[in-house]
Amino acid sequence: SQKVYDKAKENLDAFISRNILFRESKPCYYIYQLIMNGKSQTGLVCGSSVDDYENDLIKKHEFTRPEKEQDRINHIKTTGAQTGNVFLAYKNVDAIDTLINDWKKERSPVYDFIADDGIQHSIWAVNDAKTIGRITELFKTLVPVTYIADGHHRAASAAKVRAALGGENSPEGADYFLTTLFPSNQLH
């Protein structure tokens, strides 16, 4: 309902004004690790391309319902943000695994907390231009496709919002949507 979307916008605006959510000063990736019941999963948080979604480089395996897509579209339009994370899976690549694991070993997380549900969440910012370039190149050359594990409606809605905003001539942020990429060896 519009009331729910308005509350989401109010909450997002409050997080931004309190500097809980902020725009990084330069591009970065985030390494995200969650630990639940002694099992760890680590993925890479980034913006994935709407073009990749539309060109089937992000593989879908379920149909979406128009009313659920419209709900997500209304949320994006009201908040002015794509806040729903889409979880993508890919066939693991040793070089990417090593790079991510080395980054985690050599640095402290920028966020590390245990939520009320007992799940530990840790986040590392990858903000070194050379490392960002290496990660980007490894994905471009060694990960030809990803698969939607969760978030079919969120991904479809991101593509529809971009189309409504002018397609390839849309505002800069509309070309990407929030994703976390998990290698197959991290899926439990």
Language-model regions, residue ranges each:
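A cross-family signal for N-terminal binding/gating loops and helix N-caps
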Residues: 1-188
